[in-house]
Amino acid sequence: MRDKIKLVSSAGTGFFYTTDKNKRNMPGKMEIKKYDPVVRKHVMFKEAKIK
């Protein structure tokens, strides 16, 4: 089952991406390096719940 998640920037800008992930294949928290346009750099994004 694919669940919708939010990827929040670790730079503290409040910028986020939304995506989905397969919980069966990836049971832990997702961490991925992506581009944050607020700081204009690639930073780590960490998984958070969509409220």
Swiss-Prot record:
Keyword vocabulary terms for this entry: Ribonucleoprotein, Ribosomal protein
Classification via InterPro entries: Ribosomal_bL33 (IPR001705), Ribosomal_bL33_CS (IPR018264), Ribosomal_bL33_sf (IPR038584), Ribosomal_zn-bd (IPR011332)
A UniProt-annotated Pfam family: Ribosomal_L33
Gene3D superfamilies for the chain: Ribosomal protein L33
GO BP annotation list: translation
SUPFAM superfamilies the UniProt entry points to: Zn-binding ribosomal proteins (SSF57829)
Source domain of life: Bacteria
Family listed: Belongs to the bacterial ribosomal protein bL33 family.
NCBIfam families attached to this UniProt entry: PRK00595.1, rpmG_bact
Protein name: Large ribosomal subunit protein bL33
Source organism (scientific name): Alteromonas mediterranea (strain DSM 17117 / CIP 110805 / LMG 28347 / Deep ecotype)
Taxonomic lineage from the root: Bacteria, Pseudomonadati, Pseudomonadota, Gammaproteobacteria, Alteromonadales
Gene name tied to this protein: rpmG
